């Protein structure tokens, strides 16, 4: 084999990967990216985000100046801001690695996050607050960053996510908008106090890894920061941040005491006292108008349900823990319950779907629209599937970018109305549905389209059998209820809200027998918990009557649906879970208001000439006509080159050690061992949207008397599991010249096929060529320099590859941390090839085989895990593993005396593992899978060696509650294990024990 050809081919493969994935991450699939520079920002945007980029171009510098003055920023800085319309899931983030940058997902926020009049600018402000607060550095740390890079930030050692998000949420809400001025978002803090589960200050810093997990940092951190700013002033709050980010104290609680003069727990108690809650029972079922809704069967308790919708025939609900959409009919089930008694028949799973955002059922319960976020592509995309509740057959619209679907039957036809989003624009789409023979939907055709201006939000459309579609329109901070007819002319109607400060969510409509439309939705006034609102709309009479409930209840009222003239079903949100209840209107008290319905005809666009997959307009004014970009912005926009940007200017981080290693082939000739070549320097850079990351390293080791150069790339699709990859090349030299070269390529992918089923792929390839050193210093060696050098000048080549492909259904199946269910079957192709290049007459070692791996998980009684593998390596031909979690105790606590440590859970588990070999310490031949029948015969005849191991383990899962480590992604597991081996390996004992710590990140 020609080694030059081998390495040239491997280099071209890595180069091809770099070119192929240059636009991965949030810019996946984007071309013609542009950049517009302001005084402080590089605004980088993709086609489709021109208007959003223009808005930032005009306002970003002013927001930065305002925040700099607020926090007393000493040293200004320049920051890239990336705007991408690729994905439909609203979000944004700031990161200082490998250099400071902000990434914004340019899409309309969901209904639950409609808390700003100008969402784009307010979201940018939120992330810019992170950038400003994390960079409140003095002269010393500013100089360190200029030399080493933005990642040298001591705030990462002191500031937790509770403080980081607290600063952003509190400041974004200081102007009267934002989450702290939304009663829906204040609900979590109030609910914790109502239930007596108010957490300590050390328990909201980001370490909690069960629901409500990450929400605590935003809501409790934001409310606490706002409390400090309002009571003790912004100057002290900014000084606290300044001391933390300049590492003037080791911990945030030590810094707090220095700045404020008293312990943080005292301030937290004051904050607790300041939280106002209504005088209600923690259990809403104690109210005379409320009853818990249950379903028949063993799992009839509906306490972990996040979404609900109901018709006159039944109710559908979503269990996010098991990703199951379930449906149950009203009336007498196997338990003898009826709806009047607050019960459903036995619930059946109609589909399995992750990340469901809304459920909407037709008035007769025949069809169910499931709006969800698909993670099967490069970026998250909003999709809608329609399910027949009787046959469970489903139809998924090919179009993406659509959400908040509602399905209804009118004038002999089925229709679907949905909101399509692109950048900061909404379009209300109406589809005509065609049924198949079995009653399921087989086709959807776009028939009408209503366009809205930049920044206007359209939420929760709901269609009735009258043919009218009602929806919520948010313009700035003003809410109205709108309606249009799917059957008649282009007339639209507007129903104004009776009070200016009302905020509403989740409209559900049913047509009344008297020709009126009856709507149910939740609403808030300033200072209230979400309540029930009813609307009777007489379109022909141009009159609407509101009935607003007057009392708060624990958990609030979310997603109410009418099931009869007297009863409504709704979801209540508690601190640690959600539950479904029924409300009896006859026992509730309401305030009534009457308003006039206005009629207008703006012109719904008939879609006869439209295609369901045609792109939406990308620059639409507040009316309906396209705007030309601002002249100054157009002239400032230039073509953008990711490679040029990454490798020019201070766009990376220097690390004062090397990432290089010196490799040695193991005696088994099928793998490599490594010795660090640590003394040197590394440089890490990437695109302004983080991925891909590029790394370069140069290192030296005096023990090997060698130096190495390394280049690598890491990237993929971080929002989904479609692709993850890394590739690297390394060359090592010593005093004799070229020593060795090493290359590695790792690619993994998981492709969702629908429901629980997925395909998984994994490849891990390595290639080595050259001379080797030593792994350990010889006992008789007296020298330091060159102690790991070898006299063996033989050049060898090693190539290893392990490629697997699997089909599986393993998914989360319950609320428990270890609750997973499903199976997976994988086929693994293994090969390794080792040869002596300097002496071609030597025979080479090679091995190829195919193995099978079957995995099963179930958590019906206890979390169980079982795995059987056939030919997993060349050492043994059959193995099995069974593991059980006997006990899991959720702790989720941190003490006042030890706030730097968060206890997640205690686990007691055990496993049994066994493996069969044919011959003691012998290796199997290539393609031994073809001799499976012979190996099975050896097994039956007892002609094998058997080794086993049983283990009982007790572990505490802990999270460091300091700095950037205070997050579920970084955990420390303290584990005590006892081993028993009936048939031990020759180098093992029958009994052993160990205490160890395992870091997981």
Regions found by a protein language model. Name each.
Residues 23-154, 160:
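Juxtacatalytic substrate-recognition/specificity segment
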Residues 668-684, 695-717, 725-728, 740-746, ...:
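C-terminal transmembrane beta-barrel domains of outer membrane proteins
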Residues 496-505, 545-561, 594-602:
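Conserved blade-ending motifs and adjacent loop-strand segments that build the rim/top face
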Residues 24-25, 32-37, 61, 212-215, ...:
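Beta/coil-rich, acidic/histidine-enriched accessory regions frequently appended to metallopeptidases
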Residues 303-308, 355-361, 401-408, 454-462, ...:
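Repeated scaffold domains used in trafficking and secretory/extracellular systems
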Residues 25-29, 97-99, 116-123, 131, ...:
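Acidic/His/Gly-enriched intrinsically disordered linker/tail segments
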Residues 181, 319-326, 351-355, 371-384, ...:
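A flexible loop/linker signature enriched in serine peptidases of the S9 family
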């Amino acid at each position: 084999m020609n080694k030059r050809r081998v390495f040239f081919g491997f280099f071209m493969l890595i180069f091809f990967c770099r070119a192929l994935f240059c636009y991965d991450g949030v810019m996946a699939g984007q071309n013609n990216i542009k950049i517009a520079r302001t005084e402080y920002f590089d605004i980088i945007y993709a086609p489709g985000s021109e208007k959003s980029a223009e808005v930032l171009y005009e306002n970003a510098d002013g927001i930065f100046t305002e925040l700099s003055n607020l926090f007393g920023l000493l040293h200004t800085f320049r920051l890239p801001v990336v705007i991408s319309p690729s994905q439909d899931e609203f979000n944004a983030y700031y990161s200082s690695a490998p250099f400071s940058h902000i990434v914004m997902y340019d899409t309309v926020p969901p209904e639950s996050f409609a808390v700003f009049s100008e969402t784009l600018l307010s979201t940018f402000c939120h992330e810019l607050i992170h950038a400003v607060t994390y960079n409140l550095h003095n002269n010393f740390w500013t100089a360190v960053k200029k030399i080493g890079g933005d990642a040298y930030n001591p705030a990462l050692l002191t500031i937790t996510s509770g403080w980081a998000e607290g600063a952003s949420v509190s400041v974004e809400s200081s102007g009267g908008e934002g989450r702290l001025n939304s009663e829906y978002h204040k609900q979590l803090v109030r609910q914790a106090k109502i239930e007596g589960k108010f957490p300590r200050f050390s328990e909201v810093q980001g370490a909690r890894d069960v629901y409500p997990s990450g929400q605590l940092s935003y809501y409790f951190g934001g409310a606490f920061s706002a409390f400090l700013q309002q009571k003790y002033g912004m100057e002290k709050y900014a000084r606290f941040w300044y001391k933390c980010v300049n590492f003037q104290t080791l911990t945030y609680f030590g810094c707090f005491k220095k700045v404020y003069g008293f312990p943080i727990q005292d301030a937290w108690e004051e904050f607790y006292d300041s939280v106002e809650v209504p005088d209600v029972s923690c259990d809403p079922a104690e109210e005379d108008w409320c009853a818990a809704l249950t379903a028949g069967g063993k799992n009839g308790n509906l306490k972990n349900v996040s979404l609900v919708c109901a018709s006159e025939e039944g109710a559908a609900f979503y269990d996010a823990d098991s990703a199951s959409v379930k449906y149950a009919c009203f009336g007498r089930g196997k338990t003898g319950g009826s709806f009047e008694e607050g019960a459903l028949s036995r619930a059946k799973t109609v589909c399995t779907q992750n990340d469901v955002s809304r459920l909407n059922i037709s008035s007769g319960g025949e069809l169910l629209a499931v709006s969800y976020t698909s993670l099967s592509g490069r970026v998250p995309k909003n999709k809608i599937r329609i399910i027949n509740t009787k046959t469970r057959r489903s139809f998924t619209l090919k179009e993406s970018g659509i959400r908040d679907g509602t399905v209804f039957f009118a004038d002999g036809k089925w229709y679907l109305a949905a909101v399509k989003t692109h950048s900061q624009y909404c379009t209300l789409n109406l589809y005509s549905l065609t049924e198949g023979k079995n009653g399921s939907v087989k086709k959807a055709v776009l028939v009408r389209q209503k366009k809205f201006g930049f920044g206007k939000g359209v939420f929760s459309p709901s269609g009735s059998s009258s043919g009218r579609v009602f929806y919520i329109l948010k313009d700035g901070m003003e809410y109205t209820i709108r309606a249009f007819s799917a059957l008649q002319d282009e007339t639209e109607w507007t129903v104004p809200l009776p009070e200016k400060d009302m905020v509403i969510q989740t409209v559900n409509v049913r047509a009344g027998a008297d020709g009126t439309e009856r709507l149910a939705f939740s609403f808030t006034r300033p200072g209230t918990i979400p309540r029930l609102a009813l609307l009777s709309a007489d379109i022909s009479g141009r009159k609407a009557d509101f009935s607003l409930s007057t009392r708060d209840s624990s958990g609030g009222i979310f997603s109410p649906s009418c099931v009869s003239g007297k009863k409504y079903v709704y979801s209540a949100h508690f601190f640690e879970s959600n539950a479904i209840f029924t409300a009896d209107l006859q026992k509730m008290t309401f305030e009534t208001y009457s308003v006039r319905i206005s009629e207008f005809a703006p012109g719904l666009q008939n879609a006869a000439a439209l295609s369901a997959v045609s792109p939406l307009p990308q620059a639409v004014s507040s009316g309906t006509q396209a705007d030309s970009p601002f002249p100054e912005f157009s002239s400032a926009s230039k073509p953008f080159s990711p490679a040029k940007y990454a490798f020019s200017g201070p766009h990376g981080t220097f690390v004062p050690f090397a990432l290089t290693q010196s490799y040695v082939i193991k005696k088994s000739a099928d793998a490599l061992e490594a010795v660090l070549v640590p003394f040197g320097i590394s440089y890490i850079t990437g695109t302004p949207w983080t991925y891909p990351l590029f790394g370069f390293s140069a290192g030296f080791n005096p023990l090997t008397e060698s130096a190495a150069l390394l280049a690598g790339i890491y990237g993929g699709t971080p929002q989904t599991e479609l692709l993850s990859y890394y590739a690297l090349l390394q060359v090592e030299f010593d005093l004799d010249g070229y020593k060795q070269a090493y290359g590695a390529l790792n690619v993994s992918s998981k492709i969702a096929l629908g429901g629980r089923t997925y395909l998984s792929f994994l490849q891990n390839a390595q290639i080595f060529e050259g001379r080797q050193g030593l792994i350990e210093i010889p006992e008789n060696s007296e020298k330091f320099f060159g102690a790991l050098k070898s006299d063996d000048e033989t050049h060898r080549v090693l190539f290893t590859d392990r490629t697997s492909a699997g089909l599986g259904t393993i998914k989360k199946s319950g609320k428990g941390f270890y609750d997973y269910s499903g199976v997976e079957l994988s086929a693994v192709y293994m090969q390794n090839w080792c040869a002596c290049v300097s002496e071609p007459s030597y025979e080479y070692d090679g091995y190829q085989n195919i193995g099978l791996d079957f995995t099963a998980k179930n958590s019906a009684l206890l979390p169980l895990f079982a795995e059987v593998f056939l030919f997993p390596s060349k050492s043994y031909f059959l193995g099995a593993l069974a593991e059980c979690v006997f006990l899991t105790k959720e702790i989720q606590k941190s003490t006042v005396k030890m706030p730097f440590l968060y206890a997640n859970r205690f686990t007691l588990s055990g496993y049994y593992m066994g493996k069969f070999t044919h011959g003691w310490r012998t290796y199997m031949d290539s393609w031994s899978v073809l001799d499976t029948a012979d190996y099975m015969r050896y097994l039956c005849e007892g002609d094998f060696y058997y080794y086993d191991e049983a283990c009982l383990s007790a572990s505490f899962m802990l999270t460091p509650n300091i700095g950037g480590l205070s997050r579920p992604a970084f955990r420390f597991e303290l584990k005590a294990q006892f081993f028993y081996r009936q048939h031990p390996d020759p180098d093992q004992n029958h009994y052993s024990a160990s205490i160890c710590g395992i870091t997981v990140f």
